């Protein structure tokens, strides 16, 4: 799954 941190990092 995609973590919130991963989305926020982009």
Swiss-Prot record:
GO cellular component: extracellular region
Disulfide bond among keywords: yes
Compartments in which it is found: Secreted, Cell wall
The keyword Cytoplasm is assigned to this record: no
Keywords annotated in UniProt: Cell wall, Disulfide bond, Secreted
Similarity section: Belongs to the thaumatin family.
The protein, known as: Thaumatin-like protein 3
Annotated source species: Taxus baccata
């Amino acid at each position: 799954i995609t973590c919130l941190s991963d989305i926020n990092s982009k």
